[in-house]
């Protein structure tokens, strides 16, 4: 059998195996060593191919696409540093629990570690940041090779999509020549199915948890960012049964489209009210129940650490014990819909006055936040008004740093159906533009990106993807000329070197970038302009709204809001 036929059979078996296990999307970056597999992907009707020349941005694009679809997305690149450029997004996918199938083309084994060009040590390149890694055989025509491909790709996708989701790495060596014969049909498959099952809690664990909850006098629940594809109906029913205060982080997506009968239990202003020592003294808990990831607010976590409740129970699909407080007493590793159906709640011991204290504080803080958005002119007020302007049925991708914190502060419970997403696995500001672009590709809802100026600059390369596929996205850039979050941190009290090291102003404006990428552009200088300018930017698929704010005014206005709420809670 010829080398060309061996290679053709090999790569089409790979593509057929991916299609067999439900892969629909592949993000490809150009390169020579990945030629055979890239040709096979491009010629397969069952696969949608996306292109991005920058591998770092390509990986974040794939991350966003996987977030939107809750399905595994394949990344394909050539050998060498191309594969290394995937690393930041792989780290984020690992901690954010996003399924990626990373395929790195490689030199054949005889060219490794001998100084061959564009060759690095690629097997197991990503270390502990992938759930599984395997080095594939060459397309040598040996009888075991094609069955190996079928089973290992099925295994890779099963691992990536088992709880917790995460990335896997397939390193695939190709020997020259690299051209194949293009095929119209995929080969027949012999391996049919691979599944990893669900995480079901033990009966004893559920009995113990039921006992803890039913004996609690004072307790609250926290819902953080949840696993992709989580059905919120289970959680809403649990809220109705539990009847406790429920602290809902914005990324839980339980602040929007809220069922009316669940509204009395929701606490959305927890970050503001947790700054009050008087309020914290009133609501010392016996029990804290946390579902999903740790919330954005450090103040609620500091409160738990300091109070050390008798029971701090974490229920999560991730077995890595995500508890930075160090005071958890129970960890239950299970799928959310599984543990809920096993609980028996009576609530006989719970004190309704405890819920009333949370309700009173939340209502007070909500009133001040509503007033703030009407009278202030800073970034927070801008965000609050944008949340009212963005139409029902939209999704908002939010950058780390100040945007995600402002969403957490200013998003109150609403009947509007708006969902929020972010890269909070490792909380970085890198790759956010690309992630949002990928997210918009996998999403049939209108999509917005809320981002700061430095995070936008960090991933301007991500916009290259818009030259290869039409992207429907409105980018809202809060341009405060630097790193606004540091103004809230102790570093801001030391004037020497502050601007050089932390403020890092660039004095850049983004109209020329918008022009370069054929984006609709509007500039907003004042809050009075916001409504009219925002509604006017609808002409092109890709839109940029640049909103100018002042870092010093932002931090002053935020602190005045917190001080007003604190003073009222003290009274």
From Swiss-Prot:
Involved pathway(s): Quinol/quinone metabolism; 1,4-dihydroxy-2-naphthoate biosynthesis; 1,4-dihydroxy-2-naphthoate from chorismate: step 2/7; Quinol/quinone metabolism; menaquinone biosynthesis
Swiss-Prot/TrEMBL catalytic activity: isochorismate + 2-oxoglutarate + H(+) = 5-enolpyruvoyl-6-hydroxy-2-succinyl-cyclohex-3-ene-1-carboxylate + CO2
Keyword Transferase among UniProt keywords: yes
Cofactor requirement: Mg(2+); Mn(2+); thiamine diphosphate
Matches recorded under Pfam families: TPP_enzyme_C (PF02775), TPP_enzyme_M_2 (PF16582), TPP_enzyme_N (PF02776)
EC number: 2.2.1.9
UniProt superkingdom: Bacteria
Protein name in the entry: 2-succinyl-5-enolpyruvyl-6-hydroxy-3-cyclohexene-1-carboxylate synthase
Organism of this sequence: Lysinibacillus sphaericus (strain C3-41)
Gene name of this polypeptide: menD
């Amino acid at each position: 059998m010829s080398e060309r036929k061996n290679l053709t059979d090999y790569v089409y078996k790979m593509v057929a195996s991916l299609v067999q296990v439900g892969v629909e999307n592949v993000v490809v970056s150009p390169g020579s060593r990945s030629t055979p597999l890239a040709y096979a992907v491009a010629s397969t009707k069952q696969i949608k191919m996306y292109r991005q020349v920058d591998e770092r941005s390509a990986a974040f694009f794939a991350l966003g696409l996987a977030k939107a679809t809750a399905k595994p997305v394949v990344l394909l690149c050539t050998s060498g540093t191309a594969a290394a450029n995937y690393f930041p997004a792989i780290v984020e996918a690992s901690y954010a629990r996003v399924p990626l199938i990373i395929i790195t083309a490689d030199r054949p084994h005889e060219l490794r570690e001998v100084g061959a060009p564009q060759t690095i040590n690629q097997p197991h390149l990503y270390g502990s940041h992938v759930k599984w890694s395997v080095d594939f055989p060459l397309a040598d025509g040996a009888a075991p090779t094609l069955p190996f491909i079928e089973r290992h790709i099925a295994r890779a996708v099963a691992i990536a999509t088992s709880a917790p989701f995460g990335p896997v790495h397939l390193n695939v060596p190709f020997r020259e020549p690299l051209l194949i014969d293009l095929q119209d049909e995929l080969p027949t498959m012999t391996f049919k199915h691979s599944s990893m099952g669900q995480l079901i809690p033990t009966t004893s664990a559920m009995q113990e948890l039921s006992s803890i909850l039913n004996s609690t006098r004072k307790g609250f629940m926290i819902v953080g960012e949840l696993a992709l594809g989580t059905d919120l109906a289970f959680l809403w029913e649990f809220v109705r049964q539990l009847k406790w205060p429920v602290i809902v982080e914005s990324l839980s997506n339980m602040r929007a489209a809220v069922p009316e009968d669940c509204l009395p239990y929701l606490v959305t202003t927890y970050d503001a009210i947790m700054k009050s020592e008087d309020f914290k003294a009133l609501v010392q808990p016996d029990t804290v129940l946390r579902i999903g990831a740790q919330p954005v607010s450090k103040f609620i976590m500091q409160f738990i650490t300091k109070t050390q409740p008798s029971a701090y129970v974490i229920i999560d699909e991730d077995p890595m014990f995500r508890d930075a407080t160090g005071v958890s007493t129970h960890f239950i590793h299970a799928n959310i819909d599984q543990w809920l159906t096993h609980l028996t709640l009576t609530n006989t011991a719970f004190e309704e006055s405890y819920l009333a204290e949370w309700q009173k504080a939340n209502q007070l803080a909500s009133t001040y936040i509503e007033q703030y958005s009407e009278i202030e002119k800073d970034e927070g007020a801008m965000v609050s008004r944008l949340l009212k302007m963005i139409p029902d049925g939209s999704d908002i991708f939010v950058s780390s740093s100040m945007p995600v914190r402002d969403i957490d502060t200013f998003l109150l419970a609403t009947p509007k159906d708006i969902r929020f997403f972010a890269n909070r696995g490792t909380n970085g500001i890198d790759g956010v533009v690309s992630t949002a672009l990928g997210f918009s590709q996998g999403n049939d809802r209108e999509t917005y990106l809320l981002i700061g100026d430095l995070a936008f600059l960090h991933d301007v390369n991500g916009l290259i993807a818009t030259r290869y596929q039409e992207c429907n996205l409105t980018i809202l850039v809060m341009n405060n000329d630097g790193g606004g979050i540091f103004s809230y941190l102790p570093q801001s009290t030391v004037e020497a070197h502050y601007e050089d090291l932390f403020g890092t102003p660039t004095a850049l404006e983004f109209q020329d970038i918008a022009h370069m990428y054929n984006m609709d552009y509007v500039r907003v200088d004042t809050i009075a302009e916001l409504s009219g300018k925002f509604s006017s930017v609808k002409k092109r698929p890709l839109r940029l709204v640049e909103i100018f704010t002042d870092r010093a005014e932002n931090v002053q206005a935020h602190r005045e809001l917190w001080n007003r709420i604190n003073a009222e809670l003290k009274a």
